[in-house]
Amino acid sequence: MLNLFQIMNMINNDVPTPYGFYFQDSATPNQEGILELHDNIMFYLVVILGLVSWMLFTIVRTYSRNPMAYKYIKHGQTIEIIWKIFPAVILLTIAFPSFILLYLCDEVISPAMTIKAIGYQWYWKYEYFDFINDNGETIEFESYVIPDSLLEEGQLRLLDTDTSIVVPVDTHIRFIVTAADVIHDFAIPSLGIKVDGTPGRLNQVSTLIQREGVFYGMCSELCGIGHAQMPIKVEAVSLPKFLEWLNEQ
């Protein structure tokens, strides 16, 4: 039987779908901003494409009918001013929201907890800095892809892992990403997260998950023969369930 998280993933588009051509449903403010920016820019591009196509069609039709074309099509100060100012305005309209969103995505706002993700060839290791177990040690574990031969009904090939990142919803979370060998990339589409893991360097990204669910990601930097075996699985749960999970560690 499907568990609650699998049913939620069927309602919300939180997993890759065959022949999918659009984004997964957003679960964070950052991803919501990315979707809105994408849709706005696509609108501008469609308008520009239609305008340029109409101009090309009009010019070709005019020249084909009359080789001695209207003089202001070839030499006109007004049209030259228009096609310089109009594209500049469009670029500024696109650029300002992009810069604002880029700044907001890089901003880390008073994180309530920090998780360190370390990329190895070819698995992930996670460390919860803010919590310790009964032995006085930081909670940490490794995450490996589930082999095809061990997949159970409802699990996703090359996406499900033996252990998951468990986080509470409505909580500011900071991910610190690095790597131990080669460059990896920590990417989770539904959360709007994509940050490189570079050996000897710590990169950080902040997120605020707004709903419960299971979110999948992958290493998005070619890192060797086992690159496809580096999935990321995040389970967002309520705070009581998260505390219960912590007590089990």
Curated annotation (Swiss-Prot):
EC class (word): translocase
Positions with a binding annotation for Cu cation A2: C219, E221, C223, H227
GO biological process: ATP synthesis coupled electron transport
Record-linked SUPFAM superfamilies: Cupredoxins, Cytochrome c oxidase subunit II-like, transmembrane region
Entry's cofactor comment: Binds a dinuclear copper A center per subunit.
Cofactor(s) listed: Cu cation
PROSITE patterns: COX2, COX2_CUA, COX2_TM
Function: Component of the cytochrome c oxidase, the last enzyme in the mitochondrial electron transport chain which drives oxidative phosphorylation. The respiratory chain contains 3 multisubunit complexes succinate dehydrogenase (complex II, CII), ubiquinol-cytochrome c oxidoreductase (cytochrome b-c1 complex, complex III, CIII) and cytochrome c oxidase (complex IV, CIV), that cooperate to transfer electrons derived from NADH and succinate to molecular oxygen, creating an electrochemical gradient over the inner membrane that drives transmembrane transport and the ATP synthase.
Subunit annotation: Component of the cytochrome c oxidase (complex IV, CIV), a multisubunit enzyme composed of a catalytic core of 3 subunits and several supernumerary subunits. The complex exists as a monomer or a dimer and forms supercomplexes (SCs) in the inner mitochondrial membrane with ubiquinol-cytochrome c oxidoreductase (cytochrome b-c1 complex, complex III, CIII).
NCBIfam families for the chain: CoxB (TIGR02866)
Protein's recorded name: Cytochrome c oxidase subunit 2
